[in-house]
């Protein structure tokens, strides 16, 4: 059963993905599938590389934290190591994000600027994506 021919807007995203999962799709977008598999390969390779410790730097994702918290995150005198459980949790999150962006595209939504780097007032960060013209992060 094809997806309903409603205009694709971000507010129909979940409904459209559910429809795709329930009814399937006759032909998959092969370019989208190749991109998804490429992202999966990169994530597995990054996950299984030797862990070099966290890089301490100011990122856009930290906006909103107190100055004191930011100072301690960057200047913490106690060395912290990511546990295997925490690394697994981040890996799972990366895989889930890639899967959902893949499904959004297969459901007919326009997905752009995946993991695009942005710089605001000299601070670097990445956006997850823009779906149907709406920043999704």
State where each predicted segment sits.
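Metal-dependent nuclease catalytic cores that hydrolyze phosphodiester bonds in DNA/RNA
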Residues: 1-135
């Amino acid at each position: 059963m094809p997806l309903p021919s409603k205009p694709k807007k971000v507010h129909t995203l979940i409904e459209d993905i559910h429809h795709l999962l329930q009814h399937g799709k006759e032909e998959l977008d092969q370019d989208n599938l190749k991109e998804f598999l490429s992202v999966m390969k990169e994530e597995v390779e990054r996950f299984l590389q030797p862990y070099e410790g966290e890089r301490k730097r100011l990122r856009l994702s930290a906006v909103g934290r107190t100055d004191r918290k930011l100072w301690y995150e960057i200047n913490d005198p106690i060395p912290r190591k990511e546990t295997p459980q925490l690394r697994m949790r981040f890996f799972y999150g990366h895989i889930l994000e890639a899967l959902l962006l893949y499904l959004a595209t297969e459901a007919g939504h326009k997905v752009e600027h995946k993991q695009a780097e942005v710089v605001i007032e000299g601070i670097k960060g990445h956006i997850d994506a823009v779906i149907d013209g709406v920043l999704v992060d």
